[in-house]
Amino acid sequence: MSFGRDSYHHGNLREALVEAARRLIAERGLGGFAFAELARAAGVSPAAPYRHFRDRNALLAELARRGFERLTADLTAAWNEGRPDPAVAVERCGRAYLAFAGRDPASYAAMFDGNPGDTDPALRSAADAAFAVIRRAADAACAAAAGPGRPPALMVALHVWTLCHGTASLFTGPPSPGRRPLPMEPEDLLEAGLLVYLRSLGLGR
C-alpha cells in the first residue's frame, strides 16, 4: 500500500508520515506498524522518515498528541453543551469520549497503547488537558452532590474515565482472541454504567 510521493515533493512529508501511520495502525493494529513499512506506505525512501522523527516512538508520540488535542476539543464541546446540569455534562463527555475512540481507533491506540514514554512534554501536556475536562465535569458533579460519603472529585473523575476508557477498549481496535461480541451498543453500555454511578452520587435521572 502506498499513499504516493506527492506530499513528500511538496514538503509535507511529516504530515504524510503521520497519516500513513494512522492508516496502517487502523488496518493492522500497533503491532503492524514498523518504520520501514511506514516509509513504503508514504512512498518515500527508508531514510526519509528520520528527517522528521528520530524513531517509531517519536512518531507515535506525535500521533498521540494530536489525538489528545482533538479529544480535548470534543470533550470541551460536550461539557459546554451539557451544562449547567452536571449529570448531563458528564454523560455527554462520556459519549464524546466513546465517539472519538470509535471514529479514530488508530489515534486512540497510539494515545493509550503506543508506549512512547513520558519524555515528550507536549504529549504529556495534551494528555493532561484532556483529563482536565473530565476533572472539571467531576468537580461540578461533586459540588451538586455535596454530602457525607461522597468520593473526592479526583476519584470521581477517575471513575468516569475508567467507565469511558473501559467501554471504548471493548469495542475499538482490530479483532483479538480476548474480545467477545457484546449484545448491546457501546453507547448503551456506557450510558447505563454512568447512570448507575451518577445515581450512587445522588445525581442523574
Q: Would you name each region that the model predicts?
A:
Residues L13-R22, L38, L63-L71, L75, ...:
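Generic hydrophobic, amphipathic alpha-helix propensity
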Residues A16, A20, L24-A58:
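Helix-turn-helix
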Residues R92, A99-R136, G178-P183:
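Short secondary-structure transition hinges
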Residues T119-A143, L154-L158, M184-R199:
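Amphipathic alpha-helical packing segments from all-alpha helical-bundle domains
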Residues M1-N12, G173-P175, R179, R205:
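N-terminal intrinsically disordered/low-complexity leader segments
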Residues A20-E27, R70-G82, L163-L170:
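Solvent-exposed, amphipathic alpha-helical segments
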Residues T76-S107, D128, G147-V160:
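Hydrophobic alpha-helical connector segments
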Residues A16, I25, L60-G67, M111, ...:
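Alpha-helical DNA-contacting segments of helix-turn-helix folds
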